[in-house]
Amino acid sequence: MGGAARLSAPRALVLWAVLGAAAHIGPAPDPEDWWSYKDNLQGNFVPGPPFWGLVNAAWSLCAVGKRQSPVDVELKRVLYDPFLPPLRLSTGGEKLRGTLYNTGRHVSFLPAPRPVVNVSGGPLLYSHRLSELLLLFGAHDGAGSEHQINHQGFSAEVQLIHFNQELYGNLSAASRGPNGLAILSLFVNVSQVAGNSNPFLSRLLNRDTITRISYKNDAYFLQDLSLELLFPESFGFITYQGSLSTPPCSETVTWILIDRALNITSLQMHSLRLLSQNPPSQIFQSLSGNGRPLQPLAHRALRGNRDPRHPERRCRGPNYRLHVDGAPHGR
């Protein structure tokens, strides 16, 4: 898919040098899990983003793909599509439960098999099932999201990863096929106002919960979560065709970027930055900075359900609300 990436001579020498050094340090790494956001962990070389597509043939799209993510969204390039329907969320009327997990790269929430959570509408032609929620954040406020809007980053980004359950049986199969994945992305700002925090994220980031996943592989079970509370009361969205922003960088993703940011408190953000990407037996390294650098948008189309020529207009009406379980007027 796309052929082998070609290296300049100096870059090739650097790559083979670090790979040779890595081969002499400890046991051989698992090739399917040998990647990081930083090139050096615990004194060992681990491939960072510039090397993802070079160290594993199955990840070649990370280096040579033409529809990679994340991207910088310039609002002047967004094409207004008045025919985009509203987003719909289905939970079967049940509360969400699942496991909050420190993967060593992200804060991850893995929903339990039941209830099944689906998203549809917007640019999606099929119903997509929620597989995972990821939280990415930076070491400093205003720089932690993967995507940017008009060259501006946000303190964090929440990504809801879904697979097309109508065409594929699981996330792995969907990641290899057309119309396979849908990722809803919500941006997060840090508020200096006490208590000004998104209610869903507050359930994940309160002190009693977040301290249960301080180290890599720590996990904590949560229940009675209302996923619809993650979304703003009204919002627009921007969509484009892209890729997974982690290896194997499969170009099967419909991205949907919610254009109204959420808030969390400075204390909640501080708690996130205290999470370690290592187990407790190893030196502390903050989980922050867990995003891929921006990729070229090139000639891909950006579509939105709000007219960028009139950004001052408020999002009003049912098209700018999340429709929960098919309710005609949103939540």
From Swiss-Prot:
InterPro entries: Alpha_CARP_X/XI (IPR041878), CA_dom (IPR001148), CA_dom_sf (IPR036398), Carbonic_anhydrase_a-class (IPR023561). The keyword Signal applies. The keyword Glycoprotein applies. Residues 33-306 form the Alpha-carbonic anhydrase domain. Residues 303-331 are annotated as: Disordered. Disulfide bonds: none annotated. It comes from the Eukaryota. It is found in: Secreted. Residues 322-331 have a biased composition (Basic and acidic residues). One of its GO terms (molecular function) is zinc ion binding. Keywords: Glycoprotein, Secreted, Signal. GO terms for cellular component: basolateral plasma membrane; extracellular region. SUPFAM superfamilies: Carbonic anhydrase (SSF51069). Residues 1-23 form the signal peptide. Glycans are attached at residues 118, 170, 189, 263. Belongs to the alpha-carbonic anhydrase family. Does not have a catalytic activity. This is Carbonic anhydrase-related protein 11.
